[in-house]
A protein has these predicted regions:
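Positively charged n-region of N-terminal signal peptides that target proteins for export
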Residues: 1-5
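Bacterial N-terminal signal peptides
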Residues: 7-17
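Acidic, low-complexity Ser/Thr/Gly/Pro-rich repeat segments typical of extracellular/periplasmic
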Residues: 18-182, 186-189, 194-200, 212-220, ...
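Acidic carboxylate motifs that coordinate Ca2+ or other divalent cations, activating on Asp/Glu
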Residues: 206
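An amphipathic, aromatic/His-enriched active-site/gating alpha helix that lines ligand/cofactor pockets
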Residues: 209
Length: 294
């Protein structure tokens, strides 16, 4: 009997251990490495460039998430660019006519991720110029709801070099950016000058204000500038202990802390409810005392 029982018990234990999915191999460590750019055509920062198609190649298969919500081209494109992915390549085809002597930026935000784990490339902006120079100034800040100071996501923030009051409704912005989930924006590729700063929900995608859209604006004119600065950079020996604290040189772009308060303009429709006049009675008003009876 013992010769039969023990082999039977052993077979049951083996079956249970094989049926337990948690006891198998875990497939190795999770990949947290973002995709890496290996080639860009035209090259990053190209000058005098007339090509309207940009190709970016990576070291692994990538995909683009929520392109219409995250990717924005500046100067603004009335006709949305074509964005395609093919294996390790992303291509952007600009359909609008390129302006002469203009710096173009394509802000991908965190839209580019690897195909398997979805690790984002990070805040990547591709830059080229149709002229001999590249404008490098930046303007940054936040857009909050005026009534509760909550961040506003997806607002279009733009600069106007035309300081006329009518430019906001009659012309598209010179340079644009889009707010992220924290309400933060960063307008890049700005040339030196004097600007008005606006933000709008831009429901129809024409980069100008239309009645009914949420808006925000700065009361003061903006003059972008930059200066050489340093910041502390911490190197960690592990997750707890600091190994080294060193100073790093960088270019500080200003202004970098602008605050715009977004609101919806109230335009209630007014109707005439009633008119009243006492019978056989009339009032006459004059701008100054009369010296004689008319």
């Amino acid at each position: 009997m013992k010769n039969v029982f023990f082999p039977f018990l052993l077979s049951i234990l083996l079956f249970l251990s094989c049926a337990n999915p948690g006891s198998g191999p875990d497939g190795g460590p999770y990949d947290e490495t973002p995709p890496r750019i290996v080639r860009m055509t035209p090259s990053f920062g190209a000058k005098g460039e007339k090509a309207k198609k940009i190709t970016i190649e990576f070291d692994e298969i990538v995909k683009v998430e929520n392109a219409q919500e995250k990717i924005i081209v500046s100067p603004p494109q009335i006709e949305m660019p074509e964005i395609k992915t093919s294996g390790r390549k992303i291509s952007v085809n600009l359909l609008d006519t390129l302006k002469e002597n203009t710096t173009y930026t394509i802000d991908f935000s965190d839209a580019i991720v690897d195909n398997n784990e979805g690790n984002p490339l990070g805040n990547f902006t591709y830059v080229f110029s149709t002229g001999a120079e590249i404008d490098t100034l930046e303007v940054a800040g936040h857009v909050l709801q005026a009534e509760d100071l909550e961040p506003v996501k997806g607002m279009i923030v733009g600069l106007h070099s035309d300081l006329a009051d009518s430019a906001f409704v009659s012309k598209p912005f010179d340079r644009v950016a889009r707010t992220d989930g924290a309400g933060h924006f960063s307008i890049k590729g700005v040339k030196p000058g004097k600007y008005f700063l606006y933000a709008l929900s831009d429901m129809d995608g024409d980069y100008r204000y239309q009645r009914g859209e949420k808006l925000a604006f700065s009361r003061d004119t903006i003059r972008p500038y930059c200066f050489a600065d340093t910041r502390n950079d911490t190197l960690w020996a592990d997750t707890v202990r600091i190994d080294t604290v060193k100073q790093v040189n960088f270019t500080h772009y200003m202004p970098d802390n602008l605050l715009l308060l977004a609101f919806s303009e109230q335009n209630p429709t007014r109707v005439l409810l009633k008119t009243e006049r006492e019978p056989e009675y009339m009032k006459v008003y004059f701008t100054s005392p009369s010296t004689h009876i008319p």
